[in-house]
Amino acid sequence: MSIIIGIDHGYYAIKTAHCSFPAGLTSYGEHEPYTRQGLLEFGGCFFVCGSGRQPIQRDKTVNDNYYLLTLAAIAKEIKQRGLPPECSVRIAAGLPLTSFGRDKPKFKDYLLQGKQPVNFRFEGVEYSITIEEVAIFPQGYAALMTEVGLLQDEPSMLLMDLGGWTVDLMRIDNAIPAADTAHSLELGMIRCVDDIREQVRRETGLSLTDAQIENMLAGQPCTVSDTVRDIVNRQGRKYTEHLLSATMEAGFDLHAIPAVLLGGGASVVSRHLSPKDGLCKTIFLLDDKVNAVGFERALTAVSRRKSEV
């Protein structure tokens, strides 16, 4: 029996139902690096997955980076579930609705590339994975399968998926996506973090890491001065205001319809919203793995319907 594994291929992070790691990839060629953590051996070459951040590439199929990160994600999820390293897998992945129809065939072929089974080593463990199927679903909307009640309670709502590079917007009317309202803003968490880093450098001369900024935005411990923390919080509020303004300018009246916010940036907005924003209603899905879980449930539902025919 094959295993369904949902994978959210973000610009900022790769997520499965139980794992999340940065979408960075460092190639070491034929030379084994110093660490086994995140170490992928494939095709005679060594790669460290989850290190740093790779350059933004609008087309994720232009090189093998996201395929290699997919193998790492499969290995991590299999290990987390306590499953054998030799198994058959059905991948449930996603794309933004704004590019769904255009990119779906290419992304599906990309994830199915190569001979089966796919043999590789991850963190010292040998894997032999047969990818039986790749199914692609709309990001954001699939995540609502984890909160079915949301679709039943409101006639209209705005879905806001705050990813690494983009914030994808789409109105949902009577539980059906209004595809003609799909809109994408280049205001994801990478933009937020980069702006904060630059502002801190400008005001204090200090160079913060992504991890430091992310911890402070999430309200988690980080050893910095109160001055730096104040700058980060101020910029977090500024980012939230900019996002709300851009969403309104895109034609979505946040004072009139409820908004469901998910993705890695949702926690930032949740901490920096103010009553003076006057929003109709905001619902936060704060688990950054919610898309991956939604993809799995969507493929499970599709498979069930097929078996009943």
Regions found by a protein language model. Give the residues of each.
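Nucleotide/phosphate-binding catalytic cleft detector across ATP-hydrolyzing
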Residues: 1-157, 176-191, 203, 210-309
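Conserved blade-register residue in beta-propeller folds
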Residues: 16, 169-171
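Ser/Thr-glycine-rich phosphate-binding loops at phosphate-binding pockets of nucleotides
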Residues: 162-168
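A contiguous pocket-lining binding segment that forms or flanks enzyme active sites
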Residues: 199
